[in-house]
Amino acid sequence: MHSHVPAPSEEEIRSVVAPLLSLEGPLLPMLHALQETWGCVPQGAVPVLADILNLGRAEVHGVISFYHDFRDHPTGRHVLKLCRAEACQSMGANALAEETLRKLGIGWHGTTPNGAVTVEPVYCLGMCACAPAAMVDGRVVGRVDDARMDRILAEVGA
């Protein structure tokens, strides 16, 4: 989907964020638009956004690094988020995560060699009563056990 995209030009970055300039507090919507377009927030966007919004580069970078969902590199075709919060841990999430990462041969934030899936930690999906929980491309799945995880991995082509 987004892997191995060339770095966008300043003009391309400006064209993506221009429709959002009239918003109050446009930085977050701009970052989301850039990530939606390129699968990440391109490094070259930081000085462009700083210039457009009259902010320091450090301020823009600080916002990007504060929010865990913003990435500086593209993900796989699918994103699998595994809950790391206490309720899920008490229901076996740590063992499930370790086994999932072992099966895929990657670590946290890693992408499978075939580019199919990136695995990321998330801290609470709001599914505590159905722990352990996961999210696949924005779809929340509860009561994930080894068998269900195997089905999820097959579904995303891992």
Predicted regions and their residues:
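Signature of N-terminal electron-transfer/Fe-S-associated modules in redox systems
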Residues: 1-158
